[in-house]
């Protein structure tokens, strides 16, 4: 059976079409009547959607080192203003994605919207960088935080060995991959539990902070807008840190096809999640300042631990566990969502065919999940992991800005397009400008890293013409590619998705 992708792909087909019995039939076989289709099921309810957004946005930063904004604003009051403003701007981006997700009912997020508006080249470059660098690197970073804080209660009196951190991290990554390969339902249920843990951890900080306010502990808020002298360059950097802290609201759009009743669920999940996150972030910072001065917060290596040691006594030992669970939730949500990006890109012919196949029994995009495992392990044991991510930090904002600018373009080019959820045009316009500002700021503040990242991103252009456009590849290459695909199908028990209405 030969697949016909949107554009020429590495292999011209030759994979095997399977069925729910796990058998790979011959061309003459008939599918039993009433047999369940091999597709990704619509199992993402409103609660699960909310848990995915909250679970991926809230990582370790708010608990460990929320000082980037304070350091660059110079005052308690201005830092709280920036936390609130960045929450509102992130909500604008999320609302823009809600319109895109309900108008273009396909999974894939940025990739799908860029493909729809700007064509295959830019879309391929987006998924190229995401697959090879950004997602493995980001997963490794949040996983390292998980490994460090899960071990911290066992190494109170001494430094945690780096090898131990990486080994525990590797175990955590493997558990996440296995979980997402095994069951969509269980991944979503565990994500709900981990989101509950995150919110519990935030409440453990907020409630004592509110009690402190009731007791009159407001001396750190006196002259809240006076403090250290801050250069004008500091304010854009504070804005950059704030927007980065809210990043992750777009992940629900990566799994649009699995969302139950997306026209209602996506906008509701986005609004509920962003409201909870913004209020939670602001109140957590307010709680910190009821007990910790601005100077102490800037010097602390783990703000939540410092806060809990002063107010909660021995209960502060639980904070590292909550941070580890928070990191695990970010790992799980990120892998769950981004695997669908690779799945959709493969379905469009931009990645190897095997990545668009589904397990015949578990109905999970197994190859698209496990492809992240070796790439993440390489990143985990790489010495320049953080530098590599810094090189490519601008790319996220560039492609998000393009996707939201595409919304404005579609308003004028396709005015009759069905839009169940529609936002005022100033919202995507303001957010697109915000993304442009973030890219320019990256270039201005660190031109070398941004330049290197831009060059890495540009490698996607020759890769596109070599792997996608060039369709006169040697026959031996095609045969080898098809043989590898068929072998992996048999080993992994995966088949192409049955056709379905989107």
Swiss-Prot record:
Induction: Induced by diethyl maleate. Up-regulated by lipopolysaccharide (LPS) and oxygen. It is found in: Cell membrane; Cell projection, Microvillus membrane. The keyword Membrane applies. Expressed in cornea, lens, and retina (at protein level), namely in the corneal epithelium, lens epithelium and cortical fiber cells. Its main location: membrane. Residues 1-43, 96-101, 117-130, 180-193, 256-265, 339-364, 409-422, 471-502 are cytoplasmic. GO terms for molecular function: cystine:glutamate antiporter activity; L-kynurenine transmembrane transporter activity. InterPro entries: AA/rel_permease1, AminoAcid_Transporter, L_AA_transporter. It is a multi-pass membrane protein. The modification Phosphoserine is found at residue 26. One of its GO terms (cellular component) is microvillus membrane. Residues 65-74, 151-163, 211-234, 287-317, 386-387, 444-449 are extracellular. Residues 102-116 dip into the membrane without crossing it. Pfam families: AA_permease_2. L-glutamate binds at residues 135, 244. One of its GO terms (biological process) is cellular response to stress. It catalyses: L-cystine(out) + L-glutamate(in) = L-cystine(in) + L-glutamate(out); an L-alpha-amino acid(in) + L-kynurenine(out) = an L-alpha-amino acid(out) + L-kynurenine(in); N-acetyl-L-cysteine(out) + L-glutamate(in) = N-acetyl-L-cysteine(in) + L-glutamate(out). Ubiquitinated by TRIM26; leading to proteasomal degradation. Keywords: Amino-acid transport, Cell membrane, Cell projection, Disulfide bond, Membrane, Phosphoprotein, Transmembrane, Transmembrane helix, Transport, Ubl conjugation. Disruption phenotype: Homozygous mice lacking SLC7A11 are healthy in appearance at the age of 6 months, develop normally and both males and females are fertile. Mice contain approximately the double of plasma L-cystine concentration and approximately the half of glutathione concentration compare to the wild-type mice. Subtle gray (sut) homozygous mice have reduced yellow hair pigment but the black pigment seems unaffected. Sut mice exhibit a normal body weight but brain size is significantly reduced indicating an atrophy in certain brain tissues. It comes from the Eukaryota. The chain crosses the membrane at residues 44-64, 75-95, 131-150, 164-179, 194-210, 235-255, 266-286, 318-338, 365-385, 388-408, 423-443, 450-470. Disulfide-linked heterodimer with the amino acid transport protein SLC3A2/4F2hc; this interaction mediates cell membrane localization. Belongs to the amino acid-polyamine-organocation (APC) superfamily. L-type amino acid transporter (LAT) (TC 2.A.3.8) family. Heterodimer with SLC3A2, that functions as an antiporter by mediating the exchange of extracellular anionic L-cystine and intracellular L-glutamate across the cellular plasma membrane. Provides L-cystine for the maintenance of the redox balance between extracellular L-cystine and L-cysteine and for the maintenance of the intracellular levels of glutathione that is essential for protection of cells from oxidative stress. This is Cystine/glutamate transporter. It comes from Mus musculus (Mouse). The lineage of its organism: Eukaryota, Metazoa, Chordata, Craniata, Vertebrata.
């Amino acid at each position: 059976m030969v697949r016909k992708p949107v554009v020429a792909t590495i292999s011209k087909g030759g994979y095997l079409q399977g069925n729910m019995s796990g058998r790979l039939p011959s061309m003459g076989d008939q599918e039993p009547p009433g047999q369940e289709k091999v597709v990704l099921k619509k199992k993402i309810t409103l609660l699960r959607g909310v848990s995915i957004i909250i679970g991926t946005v809230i990582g370790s930063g708010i608990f460990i080192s929320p000082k980037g904004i304070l350091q660059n604003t110079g005052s308690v009051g201005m830092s709280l203003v920036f936390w609130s403003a960045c929450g509102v701007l992130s909500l604008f981006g999320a609302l823009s994605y809600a319109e895109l997700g309900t108008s273009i009912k396909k999974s894939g997020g940025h990739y799908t919207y860029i493909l729809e508006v700007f064509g295959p080249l830019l879309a391929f470059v987006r998924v190229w960088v995401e697959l090879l660098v950004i997602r493995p690197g980001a997963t490794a970073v949040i996983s390292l935080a998980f490994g460090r804080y899960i071990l911290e209660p066992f190494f109170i009196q001494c430094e945690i060995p780096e090898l131990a951190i990486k080994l525990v991290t590797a175990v955590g990554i493997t558990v996440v991959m296995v979980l997402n390969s095994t069951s969509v339902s269980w991944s979503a249920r565990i994500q709900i539990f981990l989101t509950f843990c995150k919110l519990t951890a935030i409440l453990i900080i907020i409630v004592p902070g509110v009690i402190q306010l009731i007791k009159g502990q407001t001396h750190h808020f006196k002259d809240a807008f006076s403090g250290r002298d801050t250069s004008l360059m500091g304010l854009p950097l504070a804005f950059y840190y704030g927007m980065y802290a809210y990043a992750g609201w777009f992940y629900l759009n990566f799994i649009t096809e699995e969302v139950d009743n997306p026209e209602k669920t996506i906008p509701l999940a986005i609004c509920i999640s962003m409201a909870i996150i913004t209020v939670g972030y602001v109140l957590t910072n307010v709680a910190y300042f009821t007990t910790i001065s601005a100077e102490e917060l800037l010097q602390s290596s783990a703000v939540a631990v410092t806060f809990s040691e002063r107010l909660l006594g021995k209960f502060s030992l639980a904070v590292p566990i909550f941070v580890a669970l928070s990191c695990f939730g970010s790992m799980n949500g990120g892998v769950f969502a981004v695997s669908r990006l690779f799945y959709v890109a493969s379905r469009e012919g931009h990645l190897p065919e095997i990545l668009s196949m589904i397990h015949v029994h578990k109905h999970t995009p197994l190859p698209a999940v496990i492809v992240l495992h070796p790439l993440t392990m390489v990143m985990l044991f790489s010495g320049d992991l953080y530098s590599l991510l810094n090189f490519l930090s601008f790319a996220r904002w560039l492609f998000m800005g393009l996707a939201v600018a595409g919304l404005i373009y579609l308003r004028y080019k396709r005015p009759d397009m069905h839009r169940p959820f529609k936002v005022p045009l100033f919202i995507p316009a303001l957010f697109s400008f915000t993304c442009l500002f973030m890219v320019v700021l990256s270039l201005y503040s660190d031109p070398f890293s941004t330049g290197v990242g831009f060059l890495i991103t540009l490698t996607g252009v020759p890769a596109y013409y070599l792997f996608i456009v060039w369709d006169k590849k040697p026959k031996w290459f095609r045969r080898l590619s098809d043989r590898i695909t068929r072998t992996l199908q048999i080993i992994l028990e995966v088949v192409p998705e049955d056709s379905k209405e989107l």
